[in-house]
């Protein structure tokens, strides 16, 4: 009989990210926050992990490299958006909801 796959929690994500400070700095991360279903504690086995990331140097290499790193770290699909992308969301209520729910690490 297979053991059930452990369920990743908001607290585990935050703890894991705090331990990765040096690596995050290598991708020029100024600030990283968790939002979406994991931040609300409503995740399912199929949920991706949503991050709002502010970069010191917002380059393609830093953005893409961070996305790959986070997916390997958490063994799950991630969605990464930046404050600029958040500002471009046309539905103000959606952007406000994200801003209000972000759990910064």
Language-model segment annotations:
Residues 50-53:
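Short beta-strand->loop micro-motif that forms the acidic, two-metal-ion catalytic signature
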Residues 34:
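Conserved histidines in hydrophobic membrane contexts and catalytic metal-binding motifs
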Residues 1-31, 40-41, 45, 56-105:
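Catalytic core of pol beta-like nucleotidyltransferases
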């Amino acid at each position: 009989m297979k053991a059930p796959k452990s369920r990743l929690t908001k607290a585990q994500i935050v703890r894991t990210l705090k331990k990765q400070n040096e690596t995050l700095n290598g991708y020029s991360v100024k600030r990283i926050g968790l939002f979406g279903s994991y931040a609300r504690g409503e995740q399912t086995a199929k949920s991706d992990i949503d991050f709002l990331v502010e970069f010191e140097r917002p380059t393609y290499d830093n953005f893409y490299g961070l996305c790959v790193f986070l997916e390997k770290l958490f063994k799950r699909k991630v969605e990464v958006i930046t404050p600029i992308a958040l500002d471009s969301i046309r539905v103000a209520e959606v952007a406000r909801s994200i801003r209000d729910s972000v759990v910064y690490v």
